[in-house]
Amino acid sequence: MKIKIQKIHPNALIPKYQTEGSSGFDLHAVENAVIKPHSVGLVRIGICLSLEVGYELQVRTRSGLALNHQVMVLNSPGTVDNDYRGEIKVILANLSDKDFTIQVGDRIAQGVVQKTYKAEFIECEQLDETSRGSGGFGSTGVSKA
């Protein structure tokens, strides 16, 4: 698949896969920034893109940032729809007790291209019964003593 990329910032880098087997490609910051402890920051990537119809870009947390710095993409995965043409930006949450410093060119998230499907919604009077029923949060986890 070919994805058209428009650089709108002089520090923008074209995304690339780090290995042949990588499903995600790196997204790089175009500006220096500091995200304070227990705070959220919006990080510019400096690119716009054009995806084929039927695909989305998912913006995901880099595992190293999560493990080593407790920094994650807040709305992970963030969704970039195929008809969006604005700048890609990443919402990062710093869950740590330390400042998180971002330098120009830092890999701050990863992108994964995914196929999308359109559902047809059909209103009905009642849904089929299942063994789970309406059991929600935690209902299939640890048993209650």
From Swiss-Prot:
Q: Which EC numbers does the record give?
A: 3.6.1.23
Report the enzyme's class at the first EC level.
Answer: hydrolase
Q: Which cofactor does it need?
A: Mg(2+)
Instruction: Report the superkingdom from the record.
Output: Bacteria
| GO annotation terms (biological process) | dUMP biosynthetic process; dUTP catabolic process
> Which of this chain's residues are annotated to bind substrate?
R62, S63, G64, N75, T79, V80, D81, K89
Entry keywords, A to Z: Hydrolase, Magnesium, Metal-binding, Nucleotide metabolism
Q: Does the keyword Hydrolase apply?
A: yes
Q: Which GO terms describe its molecular function?
A: dUTP diphosphatase activity; magnesium ion binding
The record's annotation in InterPro entries points to: dUTPase (IPR008181), dUTPase-like (IPR029054), dUTPase-like_sf (IPR036157), dUTPase_trimeric (IPR033704)
According to UniProt, the reaction catalysed is: dUTP + H2O = dUMP + diphosphate + H(+)
Answer yes or no on keyword Heme: no
Pathway named in the protein's UniProt entry? Pyrimidine metabolism; dUMP biosynthesis; dUMP from dCTP (dUTP route): step 2/2
Supply the HAMAP family for this chain.
Answer: dUTPase_bact
Q: What does this protein do?
A: This enzyme is involved in nucleotide metabolism: it produces dUMP, the immediate precursor of thymidine nucleotides and it decreases the intracellular concentration of dUTP so that uracil cannot be incorporated into DNA.
Q: Of which family is this protein a member?
A: Belongs to the dUTPase family.
The protein's name in its UniProt record: Deoxyuridine 5'-triphosphate nucleotidohydrolase
What taxonomic ancestry is recorded?
Answer: Bacteria, Pseudomonadati, Campylobacterota, Epsilonproteobacteria, Campylobacterales
